A protein has these predicted regions:
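N-terminal Rossmann-fold cofactor-binding loop
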Residues: 30-34, 45
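Hydrophobic anchor at the start of a short beta-strand
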Residues: 27-28, 40
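SDR active-site strand-loop-helix element
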Residues: 6, 30, 61-64, 118-123
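NAD(P)H-binding glycine-rich loop region in Rossmannoid oxidoreductase-like domains
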Residues: 42-103
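Residues at the starts of beta-strands that form the adenosine-phosphate
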Residues: 2, 26-27, 116-117
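N-terminal Rossmann NAD(P)H-binding glycine-rich loop of SDR-like oxidoreductase domains
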Residues: 3-23
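Conserved Rossmann-fold NAD(P)-dependent oxidoreductase catalytic core, especially the SDR/UDP-sugar
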Residues: 79, 85-91, 95, 99-136
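Glycine/Thr-rich phosphate-binding loops of Rossmann-like dinucleotide-binding domains
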Residues: 13, 70-72, 127-129
């Protein structure tokens, strides 16, 4: 299966890419810079640009891209992440997801052929055992 992954360079994305490759899927990474090889697909959510021809070749998309919600010091291995939840940071988080969602919606609407599987995760966190408490 040809699978496109956004956020492929992130903590979760790297693990997803490795697992897909270990299971013999052909992985295409969405990148916001010039592509370096045939397994990269250019996209720019903020500019609403995407390589539609490569997009149309995919069987599935796993969308993991977005501003990190992780604390800056999360176990010391996410130095790029986090900080206080200021208005500016909340805005970055919101727009990183909004622009990508808008781009995918418009691309799905205009594509002659499009992936039949679309999986998205916009953020995750660790809450620990909360017993019977509902966590949202």
């Amino acid at each position: 299966m040809k699978v496109g992954v956004t956020g492929a360079s992130g903590y979760v994305g790297k693990k997803v890419v490795k697992e897909l490759q270990n299971n013999s899927h052909e992985v295409f990474k969405f990148v916001r810079r010039s592509v370096k090889n045939e397994h990269e697909i250019y996209w720019s959510p903020s500019k609403q640009e995407i390589d539609i021809e490569k997009f149309e070749e995919l069987d599935a998309i796993i969308h993991l891209a977005g501003e990190s919600i992780a604390p800056k010091d999360l176990l010391g291995f996410l130095p790029f992440a986090g900080g206080r939840w200021s208005k500016e940071r909340k805005s970055r988080i919101y727009w990183s997801r909004k622009w990508a969602s808008d781009l995918f919606v418009s691309t799905f609407e205009s594509a002659g052929n499009f992936p039949k599987i679309f999986i998205t995760a916009s953020g995750n966190d660790i809450y620990g055992d909360q017993g019977d408490k509902v966590v949202t």
